[in-house]
Amino acid sequence: MNLYASQTQYGKNEEFSLEVARGLVPGHEVLNVFGYSTSVTNAAFIPAWENTAAYVFPTVASTMVVSSSSASDTAVTVLIDGLNASYSRITESVTLDGTTDVATAQAFFRINSVITTAGNAVGTIYVKNAGGTTYAQIAIGSGKTNMSVYTVPAGYTAYLTQFDAFSSTSVTSGVYATFRALRTSSTGVNNVVLQVPFLNDYSITRPYPLIVPEKTDNQWQCKSSGAGLGIGIVVLGVLVKNYQD
């Protein structure tokens, strides 16, 4: 696809964010993480994703198996976007064979997203390791993973500018949610860099972006003070390729 040149070529101004989104700023790309959970309880902090349980990152890189809950999903292709054992970016397309496991050719250490690129699945799509642990899942009708989990690739730095969280609680229910940003270094050190209680929605735009180094695991999580809540989380920023001599 051909793109019109930047408006600055004609002596006019164009928003830097738009330039990045158009792919006209070398080494920069938009980072947009969205997660949704149908029920976040008061049991523990968990990310917003398709399972109402904690998300545990793989301990080793391994091939994954992809399947559907429906035997009729045989003409559906998904693209897995993840990282290898060196935290380098890798992608792989997999065509489903119904409920039969289809193995990836590459070993994944992290999975950042999975998106449908051909067809429309009628079942739930699962991406698991050989032991049956789910690392990504596409809900029926979504076409893409909705999980507030992301690992910064090697050779890149993430600059996060906006955090939004939404809950299904009502003002009169007495139940609130707590949002937090948990990040874990490649050496296993955990840091909570943001935590705040909220009712229906929480939003912050940072004039100075939150810097997240390469190889950092991120989980944007919520916890209910009482009954289970529907939770949506949005994180925006820019992924910048590190300068190398």
Identify what each model region corresponds to.
Residues N2-R110, T117-D245:
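Beta-strand-centric surfaces of beta-sandwich/beta-rich domains
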